[in-house]
Amino acid sequence: MTKMTLLSRQALISSVAVLYLAGCGSSDSSAAPSLQNKNERAETKTQVWNIDAYAQHCTGVAQQLCLRVKPSDEESYSLHYGLIEGFEYQWGHQYQLEVTESEVNNAPADASTKKVQLKAISSVKEDSIGTEYILSDVNLQQDTLVYDDKEQGYRFLGKPFSCTEYVDCDHLYSMRETGAKVNLTFRYEGNANIALLNWN
């Protein structure tokens, strides 16, 4: 066998090996995304959620307001601690939403393991002015009630509210770090605004 023939045979073998390896790499890379997408689809589901007209105090990592949510396959409301991405809630409005819910892999310990996104708003119904919302056993902590001098108003867990004529909001505010539990009654004023009607 001549030296030239030997070199040609080695070159041919090398070319075949390169093509074979390239083909394997291409096959593996195309299969992986397909499997990943299949898993993502399996973990995502669409649901219909009913959202109540008022938010409820709750405690996750810290004290906050939680939406009252009732999926269409459940009979009672439960508290939703996380966000609904793409949805802007307004107090005094009842909503029916179509949402997608998916699992979150490797979520932080203080975060939800589920991601909820707004798909569509099916209906919105506003409460009548004067509708009352009673929040029971509110634990008064430092950030439960905030008074903003610049805005000249109070906030309850981030939600602005006004004080009706005969309510002593100053006294209530002075109790915010005592840990006392109080019942708060808010009244709907229209345009997503609320006023504190009573506390005890």
Positions of predicted regions on the chain:
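Flexible glycine-rich surface loops and low-complexity tracts that mediate binding to linear polymers
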Residues: 95-104, 176-191
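Short, basic/aromatic beta-hairpin or loop at an interaction surface
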Residues: 65-76, 156-161
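Short, Lys/Arg- and Gly-enriched loop/turn segments at beta-strand edges
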Residues: 104-115, 191-198
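N-terminal post-signal-peptidase region of extra-cytosolic proteins
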Residues: 76-87
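C-terminal motif of bacterial Sec signal peptides marking the signal peptidase cleavage site
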Residues: 20-23
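Bacterial signal peptide processing site
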Residues: 25-28
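Bacterial N-terminal signal peptides that target proteins for export
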Residues: 2-12
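Structural detector for short beta-strands of small beta-barrel domains
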Residues: 37-62, 130-148
